[in-house]
């Protein structure tokens, strides 16, 4: 499949692209004023982390500003500024999905392309032999299968994750736009990260847009071939409510951030239960938010 997705404001088309191609692009989602404030805060934080020796740099010149919800109220504002992206996440995951992590990657000049991967890299390959199943704890990031995305499987493991990236700067083919292998989410396989995957296409979009993809879709941060452009995004990874998030938000969020959360944000950040998942020790407890552990009963005689 050589389909190249283009930006749209038509949510029906976006859902179709997401279902059939594995990713979609929606433009004009975030207000330009909000995008400007996010960009300013990302650059300020990135500079401070470099100056204090706390910067996390990957693939040569890509700096990740991690756990951004602790690093400025503007990131919390961005998380729920529009229902468009959240509706598309719901289209894939259903109700109750939660945030797994929120980071701001900055792809700097002369940065090579990331290795091709899927975010749902631990997904087991569907087996017909009952005892030939994958041991999920052994499916790490270095897992690869010599495969071709055009191969379709009769049975597929469903998507458990969706990644939503906000374009804080323009994403172009030569400044590090995310690249995708169209249709790869339907292969039931993981990419061979040692291959070049020349069939990958860039998700080009203007600032204020979002690109959103199925957790099974093969993708990578593209190469930034420019001399002076920094491609900035904010990456929000969403997971089904029974999946363990990358970041434990009830534990890791600063107290002043938790105090600002509204009910929608609390649900997205895992402060409420989903059926019996996330309870405080009382089965099927329906919690809107967690209480301090000191409030829980201890040994009793």
Please describe what each predicted stretch is.
Residues 72-78, 151-152, 197-201, 220-223:
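Active-site rim elements
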Residues 1-20, 27-143:
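Non-heme Fe(II)-dependent double-stranded beta-helix
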Residues 29, 102-104, 167, 183, ...:
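Short, well-ordered beta-to-alpha junction loops that form the rim of enzyme active sites
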Residues 191, 210-212, 217-218, 222-301:
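Non-heme Fe(II)/2-oxoglutarate
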Residues 102-104, 164-166, 234-238:
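A structural signal for short, well-ordered beta-strand segments
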Residues 108, 168-170, 238-240:
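Non-catalytic surface loops within mature trypsin-like serine protease
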Residues 112-204, 244-253:
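Catalytic core of non-heme Fe(II) oxygenases with the double-stranded beta-helix
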């Amino acid at each position: 499949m050589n389909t190249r997705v283009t930006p749209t404001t038509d949510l029906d088309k976006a859902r179709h692209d997401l279902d059939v191609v594995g990713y979609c692009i929606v433009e004009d989602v975030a207000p330009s004023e909000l995008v400007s404030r996010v960009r300013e805060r990302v650059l300020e934080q990135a500079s401070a982390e470099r100056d204090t020796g706390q910067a996390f740099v990957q693939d040569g010149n890509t700096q990740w500003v991690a756990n951004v919800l602790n690093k400025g109220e503007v990131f919390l504002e961005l998380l729920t500024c529009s229902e468009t992206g959240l509706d598309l996440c719901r289209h894939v995951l259903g109700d109750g999905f939660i945030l797994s992590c929120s980071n701001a990657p900055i792809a700097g000049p002369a940065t090579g392309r990331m290795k091709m991967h899927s975010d749902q890299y631990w997904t087991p390959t569907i087996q017909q032999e009952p005892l030939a199943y994958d041991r999920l704890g052994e499916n790490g990031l270095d897992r690869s299968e010599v495969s071709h995305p055009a191969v379709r499987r009769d049975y597929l493991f469903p998507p458990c994750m969706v990644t939503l990236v906000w374009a804080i700067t323009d994403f172009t083919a030569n400044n590090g736009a995310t690249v995708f292998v169209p249709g790869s989410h339907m292969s039931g396989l993981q990419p061979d990260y040692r291959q070049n995957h020349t069939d990958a296409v860039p998700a080009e979009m203007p600032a204020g847009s979002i690109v959103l993809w199925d957790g099974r879709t093969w993708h990578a941060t593209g190469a930034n071939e420019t001399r002076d452009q920094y491609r900035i995004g904010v990456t929000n990874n969403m997971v089904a409510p029974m999946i363990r998030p990358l970041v434990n938000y009830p534990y890791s969020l600063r107290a002043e951030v938790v105090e600002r959360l509204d009910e929608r944000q609390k649900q997205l950040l895992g402060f409420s239960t989903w059926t019996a998942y996330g309870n405080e020790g009382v089965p099927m407890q329906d919690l809107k938010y967690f209480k301090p552990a000191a409030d829980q009963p201890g040994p009793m005689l």
